[in-house]
Amino acid sequence: MNLPTPLERAPDGLAPGIGLWLKREDRHDLGAFKWRGAAPTVEAYRSKGAAAVVTASTGNHGAATAWAAARSGLRSIVFAPQSVSQTKLALLKQ
């Protein structure tokens, strides 16, 4: 599973004279890099015949796992603690 992320030139003041480029993992749907670990793991389970994946998370890991599962045609269940923020809960439900 490949998800392109944009490259942006870093502001000159960040690394003067270097010409630094940034790979912006925060610029895709999930807004985090966690999908890079979740996607191949979910795909491995799918290729072994899994129908669903289950994880426990308070945010980005759970969202990435659910995202990867949906794109692999699998069902996902994410357990979150009662203390999870409403923002993270909304992300998990997406």
What feature does the model see in each segment?
Residues 1-94:
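PLP-dependent amino-acid enzyme catalytic core
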